């Protein structure tokens, strides 16, 4: 007798629903419309991004990159890993697969502790953010924007920072008032003085190209690229567009972003890397099927640039585009930690011990 409402992107969950509401057409300010509502059967016929993606099954890649080398993991016993030994390929895109709790993250944690070179970890727990973190501060372009305002108005740069002299006196630049409810979760309300802009009234009087600092910081990444045109930091903004985050606002609190979005913000700052090893922890978390398709193009480009990618992932669409798959299991916790399979996606289809094999076959 319960009503269950699920925010979801997975094909399998969408197919189980009695009623589906498809939002769009895009993300951020370009979304917010109901594109379709009704049954799953009719969604498959609908001319929406979701409908088109559900009608299309991602093909399996049949030509695989050749590893430039291998790293041998020997007798790993971290957490639930059961004396696990496996050769990990370098210079290619590898998916670390397995059911929840099977030891995927433990394997990568052990690898990072043993590998003699640098490893770039892009995992949700590694991204340090707080209530004041925004895409502008994370990409280190906020100072450059403040400098433009300061130069145009002949005042100190600190006036255009909500972490300094420009902060709203009521909320101290947070944009919200946090009320501590003792035995209950804290309640956040929009600041009534600055109305969420984070800045003092005095600062908002200053303008650059007809906009005040709050209006500029409230722009989306795509809008900011057009507004600032030839500024040096536009290149950094473009990296967010490349990872599919052009809809984010410069001042958007990063605490509002999904795990997948957070990883892509960090990934944006690493797009020019060559010959590096990356570990990505479920980067498709919270992503639409179309977002995953675009993300895989980016991952393939990174691999072609000579990087090694290890992707901890459950998405079959990602597995089908990998060069190599390492599967752990068979279960989670104490029932996991064993090597079930290591090879190409095509070889997985014939692997009798693989738990994932059955689902990979069904997805073709």
Task: Give, region by region, the residue ranges found by the protein language model.
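Conserved phosphate-binding elements of NTP-dependent enzyme cores
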Residues: 1-364
């Amino acid at each position: 007798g319960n009503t269950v409402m699920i925010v979801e992107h997975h094909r399998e969950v969408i197919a189980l629903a009695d009623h589906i509401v498809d939002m769009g057409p895009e993300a951020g300010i370009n979304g917010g419309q109901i594109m379709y509502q009704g049954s799953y059967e009719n969604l498959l016929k609908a001319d929406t991004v979701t409908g088109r993606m559900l009608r299309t099954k991602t093909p399996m890649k049949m030509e695989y990159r050749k590893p430039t080398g291998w790293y041998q993991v020997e007798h790993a016993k971290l957490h639930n890993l059961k004396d696990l030994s496996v050769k990990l390929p370098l210079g290619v895109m590898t998916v670390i697969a397995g059911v929840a709790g099977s030891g995927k993250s433990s394997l990568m944690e052990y690898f990072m502790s043993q590998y003699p070179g640098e490893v770039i970890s892009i995992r949700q727990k590694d991204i340090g953010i707080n209530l004041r973190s925004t895409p502008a501060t994370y990409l280190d372009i906020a100072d450059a924007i403040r400098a433009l305002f300061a130069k145009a108005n002949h005042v100190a740069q600190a006036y255009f920072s909500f972490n300094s002299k420009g902060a709203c006196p009521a909320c101290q630049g947070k944009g919200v008032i946090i009320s501590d409810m003792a035995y209950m979760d804290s309640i956040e309300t929009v600041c009534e003085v600055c109305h969420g802009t984070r800045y003092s009234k005095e600062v908002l009087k200053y303008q650059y190209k007809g906009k005040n600092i709050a209006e500029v910081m409230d722009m989306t990444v795509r809008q900011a690229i057009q507004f600032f045109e030839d500024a040096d930091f536009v290149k950094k903004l473009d990296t967010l567009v490349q990872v599919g985050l052009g809809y984010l606002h410069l001042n958007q609190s990063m605490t509002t972003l999904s795990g997948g979005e957070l990883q892509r913000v960090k990934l944006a700052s690493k797009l020019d890397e060559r010959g590096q090893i990356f570990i990505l922890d479920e980067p498709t978390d919270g992503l639409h099927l179309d977002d995953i398709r675009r993300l895989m193009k980016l991952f393939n480009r990174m691999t072609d640039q000579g990087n090694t990618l290890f992707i901890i992932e459950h998405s079959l669409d990602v597995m089908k585009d990998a060069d190599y798959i390492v599967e752990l299991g068979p279960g989670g916790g104490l029932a996991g930690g064993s090597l079930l399979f290591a090879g190409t996606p095509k070889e997985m289809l014939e692997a009798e011990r693989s738990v994932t094999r059955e689902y990979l076959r069904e997805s073709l």
